Amino acid sequence: NGKYCTFPHAIEFLNRKYADIFPILTSYPELENYLSPFMDAWESSAVEQLQGQIASAKIPLSRMISPALYWVMTADDFTLDINNPEEPKVLVVGNNPDRQGIYGAALGLYNSRIVKLINKKKRLKSAVIIDELPTIYMRGLDNLIATARSNKVAVMLGFQDFSQLKRDYGDKESAVICNTVGNVFAGQVVAETAKTLSERFGKVLQKRQNMTINRNETSVSINTQMDSLIPASKISTLTQGMFVGAVADNFDERIEQKIFHAEIVVDNEQVKRETARYVKIPQIIDFTDKDGNDTMQQQIDANYYRIKNEVRQIVADEIERIKADPELSHLIKDK
């Protein structure tokens, strides 16, 4: 029933010995072909080759071994199909700047799963809003932007600069993300980002007037040439509150003025009034025992050790199953 099919269980299993992992996985016909190269290397005692291949996966995952993270990523408090008409949800997750590399991987896992679940027909209107996009990796984001509009999913991304996105997502994927979005709002940016935005906004035919004055006469010439609608120099010197951007329209909702350079006025008094009406997030789980003691850490630690013990027991049961099966017993190497 999926009770043990959690990410923490997978991490614990991956950190078992090769003598446990390979026979167990190979014993399942649907996994046998995937494990074949590893089994060949293991049976031929090519341990160094195996260690190099598997360490690249084990080391990043091992950094995620944490009682707190194990607590969050086990059990089934809710499903991730946030736009399910039967059970709609608002899901908010945040990264920790001090442990960005660790939690970013966990958030990326959740995000990738959410993308697959929400991008379907016959679902509620929904939105995926990501601030500081480069701090987490979201697999399939480019495809979500390209296809989600037809499934009533709005995608809103916030980041400081295109160079950040290139650094963390790579040149190709970041280029696809930037070129696929239909609406762009930008404040002050410099260098390559300002130049890219200026090119995106296009050029317009502008008149230029030149006046030449000498002792005998004054001459005026008027000519036209294509110039940037919003020059990069202007984008790089925008003041606070000033934005440039471009918006997309629909067949039945035409927008004549798609490019803008204007001030977005924020009603600070209204914001304060709204902030004053905020309510506290309700307490979902109470860790206080009957004597009034806070047992949060004890319960989190107990969950951590429970997962480790469950994986040990699963491995032991699977090894016994393989030994008892004449067709599989050859997978267990004699020590």
Question: Which stretches of residues belong to each language-model region?
Answer:
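P-loop NTPase motor domains
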Residues: 1-153, 168, 236-239, 247-254, ...
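Structural recognition of the conserved hydrophobic beta-strand(s) that form the central parallel beta-sheet
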Residues: 154-160
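Hydrophobic/aromatic beta-strand patches that form the interior of the parallel beta-sheet core
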Residues: 91, 156, 183-185
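P-loop NTPase motor core of the ASCE superfamily
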Residues: 143, 166-313
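Acidic, glycine-rich active-site loops and adjacent beta-strand->loop/helix elements
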Residues: 134, 162-163
